[in-house]
Amino acid sequence: MTTLEAVILGIVEGLTEFLPISSTGHLILVSNLLGIQQTEQHKAFEVSIQLGSILAVVFLYFKKFLDTNLMKRILIAFIPTGILGFVLYKIIKSLFNPYIVVFMLVFGGLLLILIELYHKNKSYDINSIYEVPYQKAFLIGVFQSLAMVPGTSRSGATIVGGLLLGLDRKTAAEFSFMLAVPTMFMATFYDVYKNRSNFNLSDWENLIVGFVVAFISALFAIKWLLKFISNHSFIPFGIYRIILGILYYLWY
């Protein structure tokens, strides 16, 4: 992998991680377009640069992470994914291919549109991340565990789960952002540890480049998304997922 490719993948990761359009799916698709093979080493790179996106959330929400009651909710939501991710690690890795990504992009897009249409004239009961009940936090975590299939979108699954459970768009998005921290940190740490012997000096340099670029890109993406959903629904993201999935299927 070249430094330029690391920069491109870092931008893709940072811009898509917290949008409901599947960062993993985009990384796989872009890697294929760049002619990069999906080796175990490259898969580890894709997961590892997510650390940059994680730190962007920590940077923006640092004070909220110091709230004990809020962190209890986040940790409860993390439990389903933490357990299933550890148990199903090898199976999840075997699913990293473009065809599964295309299917999940289209399916997830349709689901996102249907959920928004269903909630079009309904009010939301929960308007703050501090108000999310523990049982609903756990259920959002269950939704997140479904997103272990590439192309599903972790943020998309948690946002859909939040909307179905009565969270408004901003609350669902912010809870999704914060839940990403323990989830992605554990996934990143585990992948880097398992593949540490496969990285040479050049690989580590590319990891650092991808990490920094992902961090900067994620800062912009998070701020933009919160501003966008204050006046718009998630339907445009659903349409985007469907179009992207169809175009890539036709091209591939």
UniProtKB/Swiss-Prot annotation:
The keyword Oxidoreductase does not apply. It comes from Sulfurihydrogenibium sp. (strain YO3AOP1). Belongs to the UppP family. InterPro entries: UppP (IPR003824). This is Undecaprenyl-diphosphatase. It is a multi-pass membrane protein. Disulfide bonds: none annotated. It is found in: Cell inner membrane. It comes from the Bacteria. Keywords: Antibiotic resistance, Cell inner membrane, Cell membrane, Cell shape, Cell wall biogenesis/degradation, Hydrolase, Membrane, Peptidoglycan synthesis, Transmembrane, Transmembrane helix.
